[in-house]
Amino acid sequence: AESSTSGSDTASADGFATTDDVSDAPDITGITIESQMVLNYAECFNVYYCTDGYKLIDVKDGAQYLLVPDGKEAPDDLDSDVIVIHQPLERIYMAATSPMALFDAIDSLDTIRLSGETADNWYVQDAVDAMNAGTMIFAGKYSEPDYELLVSENCDLAIESTMILHSPKVQEMIEMLDIPVFIDRSSYESQPLGRTEWIKLYGAMLDKEEEAADFFANQASIVENLKDFQNTEKTVAFFYINTSGAAVCLLYTSPSPRD
């Protein structure tokens, strides 16, 4: 991949910004990288903007994904290990749970046709409403998807959590059906706003970068306003009840207690 390294930034009025300093960009045969998305907290992904409207998502310790614009094809000489995702995305299988709220925040639940959870398991009310209305349907949990339904519904992308790494045969089967698999690694971010900033990645997938940047800026502002919040020095026990009915207490280093 050819690249520019002058280092200037460009930003729209709503906060979406790119830089043409791509000196650290991966070298991918078949594409020319021109700029990359500016990130403030996230450390586990980068989004690169290429010639002719292509975008490259590079997930740390994960995979690389090429977003191919509507009406175009992947370059013939593209590196074989780059996963190709064709836009527009309209019939996603959402097997991961955390991205649902991010899709909802940029008004994009209509791109999700298939769900890895039943309506009563969703914490996002708009997702519950979509399932009750039939515009989003249950397609099996991440570990046991309904492959026939994925095919009959013309699924164009499966979004999975890292739990799919424990079910490699499931991922392989989905890919054998010519459905690209994107693995969300937002849980590996070291701080809450890093995980929230993954909304910018999904904004790039859906060509909604401005909407995603607006939402993130608002959330960052809320957190910034808490910087002077007085520490009471009080502690709290954080636990949940698992499917066996047992109380599970998380370590203080785990994401929820830290957040």
Q: Where in the sequence are the language-model features?
A:
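Bacterial Sec-exported substrate-binding components of ABC uptake systems
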Residues: 2-100, 211-237
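Active-site catalytic microenvironments for nucleophilic, acid-base chemistry
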Residues: 105, 205, 256
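Conserved small/polar residues in nucleotide/adenosyl-binding loops
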Residues: 252-259
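A short, structured surface patch at a secondary-structure boundary
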Residues: 53-59, 64-151, 157-164
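Glycine- and acidic-residue-enriched helix-capping/strand-helix junction motifs
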Residues: 114-115, 246-251
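Extracytoplasmic substrate-binding proteins
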Residues: 135, 148, 152-247
